[in-house]
Amino acid sequence: MEDEAVLDRGASFLKHVCDEEEVEGHHTIYIGVHVPKSYRRRRRHKRKAGHKEKKEKERISENYSDKSDVENADESSSSILKPLISPAAERIRFILGEEDDSPAPPQLFTELDELLAVDGQEMEWKETARWIKFEEKVEQGGERWSKPHVATLSLHSLFELRTCMEKGSIMLDREASSLPQLVEMIADHQIETGLLKPDLKDKVTYTLLRKHRHQTKKSNLRSLADIGKTVSSASRMFSNPDNGSPAMTHRNLTSSSLNDISDKPEKDQLKNKFMKKLPRDAEASNVLVGEVDFLDTPFIAFVRLQQAVMLGALTEVPVPTRFLFILLGPKGKAKSYHEIGRAIATLMSDEVFHDIAYKAKDRHDLIAGIDEFLDEVIVLPPGEWDPAIRIEPPKSLPSSDKRKNMYSGGENVQMNGDTPHDGGHGGGGHGDCEELQRTGRFCGGLIKDIKRKAPFFASDFYDALNIQALSAILFIYLATVTNAITFGGLLGDATDNMQGVLESFLGTAVSGAIFCLFAGQPLTILSSTGPVLVFERLLFNFSKDHSFDYLEFRLWIGLWSAFMCLILVATDASFLVQYFTRFTEEGFSSLISFIFIYDAFKKMIKLADYYPINSDFRVGYNTHFSCACLPPDPVNLSVSNDTTLAPEDLPTVSSTDMYHNATFDWAYLSKKECVKFGGKLVGNNCDFVPDITLMSFILFLGTYTSSMAMKKFKTSRYFPTTARKLISDFAIILSILIFCVIDALVGVDTPKLIVPSEFKPTSPHRGWFVPPFGGNPWWVCLAAAIPALLVTILIFMDQQITAVIVNRKEHKLKKGAGYHLDLFWVAILMVVCSFMALPWYVAATVISIAHIDSLKMETETSAPGEQPKFLGVREQRVTGTLVFILTGLSVFMAPILKFIPMPVLYGVFLYMGVASLNGVQFMDRLKLLLMPLKHQPDFIYLRHVPLRRVHLFTSLQVLCLALLWILKSTVAAIIFPVMILALVAVRKGMDYLFSQHDLSFLDDVIPEKDKKKKEDEKKKKKKKGSLDSDNDDSDCPYSEKVPSIKIPMDITEQQPFLSDNKPLDRERSSTFLERHTSC
C-alpha cells in the first residue's frame, strides 16, 4: 500500500447499491463503520480533479466498459465480498504510518487479576493468567502455572470487548504516581461522564484497592490480631447501615486496603525469576475483572498512562504499569467478564494492537485496532474443536511484519530467506547488494570496502568479549589443526616432502592471522582445499618429468596468479558474484559438505584396514592364537640372560649392537621394532590388533552423536536456560574432552594426533625462502602465466562462492561484506606463501560455516513458549586471529595435543559436514523425493510451485552435483573450478525450462530479469499516477466502495451483557451493529 491517503473521488464516481438478493443470499451482513472526523483532518490539502485525474477516470471507465458482462458481474460480487480497504485498515494506516522518531514501543507483560473470595470470606484480586506472547493460566488445584499455549478466544467475547471500548471510559496519556491516585482519577472521570453514581465511588474505590495475591506468593498465616481486624467481605461492610457516613466509610476502608499497597516493589517481586523472560525496558498492562453486588451496570475503564509508573504489588513482576483495563459488573456474569479480560489481554500481546495501543489518539483508534484484529482472526467450528484443548506454541511464529507493513507502507515481505515476493517473482539474490555494485572506477570497489569496514575496526575487537567467543576459538582451532595435519600429510606425499605438515601449520597460521586482522569479512576461515592439492600434485610431477625446479616454477605461478587476482580487484570483477544464485551456492556448499562426510568415513575405513579385526577369533580357544618375533638367523643371539636388554633400553641400541655386541631377547620387541630390526613375525594373530578398530569407531560415532545432541540441548526441557545455553555453546569441546577421557580410561592404543615438535622445513633440500631465479630457464617465468590462469579461476571461484555463502542475508550481518578487500588479501598472501614455499590458502566453505554457527546470537530473553529469535552473528576479528595464532603455536603444544585420538577429530569432521547441510533448501527438497505427499512439510515453495516442477529442479541439481563429484575424483579435478563456473551457465539455461514465478520460489532471480522487472514497475507507477497501489493488483476498476466488517447474524439477536437484566429492549440495547448498518 501507499503511505499517502486515498483520494476522494466523490460518491457519484461509482456507487454500489445493495440489492435485496445480495443481502438475503448470504448468512452474514456487512456493517460500515463511520470514519471519525479526525481521519478527515489527517488528510492533506484537497485537490480538485484536474485534467490528469479526469483523463484517468475516462481511461478506467473505458477499461471497465470493455470487459464482458460476466467479468463485470464477477467484479461486482467480489467488491461486495472483499472490499479493498476496510475503515479499520484506513485508520490504522494513519496510526502506524505516521513518521515518528520515537523508539519502538517496549514489550508488554499483561496480567489478568480477578476479584475472588479467599477462604470463602475476604475478597482479593487473584492473578489467574499472564501473557507475554502466549497465555499461561494458574492451574485450578496444582498451584502452578500451565505450559504456555495459544490463547483461544470466543468470538462473542471479542464483540463484547468492542462494545466495552465504545461504552466505557477511555483515558489516554493520564498522569498518576500511585494506584490510589489512579483509582481516584478513574472514579471521578466515571462520575463526570455519568457512568457511575457518586454514592458508589467509595465502594468501587475500596474494591479496586483490595490486596493483590500473585501465584508466586504462598498463603500467609495470619496472626490472631489480624483475624479480628480484617473485614469478612466487602459486601457485608457496605450492607451494614451502622457504618457511618460514606466519607467515614471511605476513609476507614481505604486505609485498611492501603495497608497492602506500596509504590515500591516487594521482595517477592524482586526475587521473581520470571523477570529473566522480560527485556529490561518492559512495561506492564494490568487487567482487573470481577463481579460485585453493588453495581447495576458495568464499570469499564481503559487507561493509558503518560509515563509508566511502578504501582507496588499490582503486578507480579517489578515492572512499571502503562495500561490498566478495569471491568466490574453485576453478579451472575463472572464467566463473561473472565472471557472479556482474556480477550483484552490477548489483544495487548498482539504485536499490531500493541503498537496501536501505544499510538492511539482516541477511542476510535482503539476500536479500529479491535476491528483489524477481527479481520485477521480465525474461527474454528464448535463441533470440530474442543476449546479446553491447549494449542502448543508453534516452533516458528508467523511474522507480523506483513500486517504492519501493509499499514505503514513498508517493503514487501520476504520469502525464500532473502528474496522479496513481488507478485510471485523474487528479487535477484545478490543483485541489490551494495558491496557488489560496479563502480566503474579504478579500485573503486576496494576503496568502498575499506571505507565501509574502517569504522567497525575497533568494534571488531571489543565485540568478541563474550564467553561464546571462547567456545568458537577452541572448536575452530581443533578443526583447523586437524585439517592442517591432514592436508600437510597429503601434500607431503604429493610433493616428496617439499611441502609437509610443518609448512601447512606455518602457512595456515601466517595467512589466516593476517587475513582475519585486515580482510573485509573476518568470519571467513582460510584453509587449503582439494583442488589446490590436485594442482600441486600435477605441478610437482610435471616439474619432475621436465627437470624443472618445482619451488621456483611454483613461485612464478603464484606471482602471476596474484597479479591476475589484483587485476580482478582493480576492475571490480567481484560484481560477477551476483550471478551466483542459490542454485550455484547450494551445489558448491553441498559438495564440500559431502566431501567432509565422505573423507571422515574414508579415514575410519583406512584405519580399520590398518588395524584389522580378527573375525576368526573364537572364545575359549585363546591358546590357538599367538604371535612371536624370531631373529633373522637361527643362531643363539640371546643365550646369556645376564645381558638381556629390557624394552626401555631399545632406543639406545643400534642394529649392529643387536647382532654383534649384545645378546638380545627378541620376545621383548614390538611388531614395528621386530620388522625394523629384520626379525620375523610368526603366528596366526600377527596381522590383527585387538580392540583398536572397535574403540576407534566408538570414539568416532560417539563424538559425532554427542556433538549433535549437545548442540541441540539449548531447546531441551532439562536444566535451567543458562546451563542449556552453556552446554550448547561448548558442545564440540565438551564432546572432545569426554571421549578423550574415555579413551584414556579404557587404555586402548588408538592412533593419536601427531604434531611436529621441531621448527624446521620438512625436506632438508629446501629453506624458508625460494629464490626467483637460477633454477629454471628464463622462459619458464613467462610460461608460468598459463597455469596461473587456471589457478586464478580456482582461487576466485573458491573464495567468492564461500564469501557469498558467509554473507547471505539470513545470517543478518550488520557490518557489511568486503568481496574486493578479501580477494586483495588472498592475492597478497599468495605472494608471501609462494616466496616461503608454503601452501596457498583460500576460503574454506565448511569451516567458515561452522565458524558462523558457533557465533550465532539469539535473544537473551524470550517469552514462555516462544523460541529464541536469531539476532545475527557476533561479527569480530578476535576468534579467527586467535585460532590461527594457536595453530602456529601448536608445534610447542605437541605434548598436550598427542593425547587427542584421531577418531575423535574425524568425528568432528563428520559433525561439520552434517551441520553445514542444516537449513540448506536443496537438502529439504531432496527429502521430498522420498516423502509421501500427505507427510510433506508446509514449505512456502510447495504452495506456489507444482510438485513435479520442484522434483525436476532438484533432479537437475543432483545431476550437476554427481558430475562435479565424478570430476573431482579423477585426474581432471584440476578443471574443477571451471566446472563450478559452468553451474552459472546451467542456471542461466533454466530460465528457458522454468518460469520466473517458479524460480523466484526455488532459487534467486538472475539480476537482468530483476532489473527489467523493476524498470517495468517504474513505468507502471508513472502511468498509475496517484491511484492507490491496491488497485494495481486488482481486476476491478477504482471505486469508492463502502468498506465493511462481517458480523455473524446471531450476534445481533443476543442481548448485550451491558444491558440491564430486563426483557430484551431493542431500542435500549442497540449496538454498533444497528447504528452503522450500511445496507
UniProtKB/Swiss-Prot annotation:
Entries under Gene3D superfamilies matching the protein: Helical hairpin bin, Mannitol-specific EII, Chain A
InterPro entries: Band3_cytoplasmic_dom, HCO3_transpt-like_TM_dom, HCO3_transpt_euk, Na/HCO3_transpt, PTrfase/Anion_transptr
Bias (Basic and acidic residues) ranges: 53-70, 1062-1079
Chain intervals for the UniProt region annotation (Required for basolateral targeting): 1057-1059
Reaction equation(s) it catalyzes: 2 hydrogencarbonate(out) + Na(+)(out) = 2 hydrogencarbonate(in) + Na(+)(in); 3 hydrogencarbonate(out) + Na(+)(out) = 3 hydrogencarbonate(in) + Na(+)(in)
Residue numbers spanned by region Disordered: 39-78, 235-266, 1012-1079
Membrane-crossing segments per the record: 467-491, 502-520, 522-542, 551-571, 586-609, 693-710, 726-745, 780-807, 820-836, 838-855, 878-894, 902-918
Intramembrane segments: 961-986
GO BP: bicarbonate transport; establishment of localization in cell; metanephric proximal tubule development; positive regulation of glycolytic process; regulation of intracellular pH; regulation of membrane potential; regulation of pH; sodium ion export across plasma membrane
PTM annotation: Phosphorylation of Ser-1026 by PKA increases the binding of CA2 and changes the Na(+):HCO3(-) stoichiometry of the transporter from 3:1 to 2:1. Phosphorylated in presence of STK39 and dephosphorylated in presence of PP1 phosphatase; phosphorylation seems to inhibit SLC4A4 activity.
Polar residues composition-biased segments: 251-260
Stated regulation of activity: Inhibited by 4,4'-diisothiocyanatostilbene-2,2'-disulfonic acid (DIDS).
Tissue specificity remark: Specifically expressed in kidney and to a lower extent in liver, lung, spleen, brain, skeletal muscle and heart. In kidney, expressed in proximal tubules at the corticomedullary junction. Isoform 2 is specifically expressed in kidney. Isoform 1 is expressed in kidney and pancreas while isoform 3 is specifically expressed in brain (at protein level). In brain, isoform 1 is expressed in astrocytes while isoform 3 is expressed in neurons (at protein level).
Function field: Electrogenic sodium/bicarbonate cotransporter with a Na(+):HCO3(-) stoichiometry varying from 1:2 to 1:3. May regulate bicarbonate influx/efflux at the basolateral membrane of cells and regulate intracellular pH.
Protein family: Belongs to the anion exchanger (TC 2.A.31) family.
The protein's assembly and partners: Homodimer. Interacts with CA2/carbonic anhydrase 2 and CA4/carbonic anhydrase 4 which may regulate transporter activity. Isoform 1 but not isoform 2 interacts with AHCYL1 (via PEST domain when phosphorylated); the interaction increases SLC4A4 isoform 1 activity. Interacts with AHCYL2.
Name this protein carries in UniProt: Electrogenic sodium bicarbonate cotransporter 1
Source organism (scientific name): Rattus norvegicus
